[in-house]
Amino acid sequence: MASTDRIEAFLAEPRNVIVAGIRRDGRPHLSPNWFYWDGQRFYVSTTRSRVKYAIFRRDPRAQLLVDDPTGFRAVLVPATAEIREDIAAELPRFRAIREKHGLAVPDDEKHLRALTAEGRVLLAFTPDQPPSSWTAWGLD
């Protein structure tokens, strides 16, 4: 079993999370996303026009998969989604996502205008279990 410290270190690296939600017809919807993990929640930026926005408005159940390109290390997390639409309040998390993945972040005012113009919202995924109960492989 992977230690919580190893899981935390793995999640701190710049990588994608595959977010799975449930379509209306019951099929899974999967999408790769940049993310930020703050030790309690996973944060993903999206827009109101995306399928995942509609899915998580209807049904907050989610499954998250964070892996590396080889596929030999991964963490699987059952979670519950919350849509956060107050962009100004969530600006630190939008900033953290960009910084984690090596992108420059404009000043707050310019960043807020861009996020608003794009119709951005923040998806906050709260794990349904503590990290010690997540399925993880290759992190031993």
Question: Can you describe what each PLM-predicted range is?
Answer:
Residues 11-12, 57-58, 116:
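Alpha-helix boundary recognition
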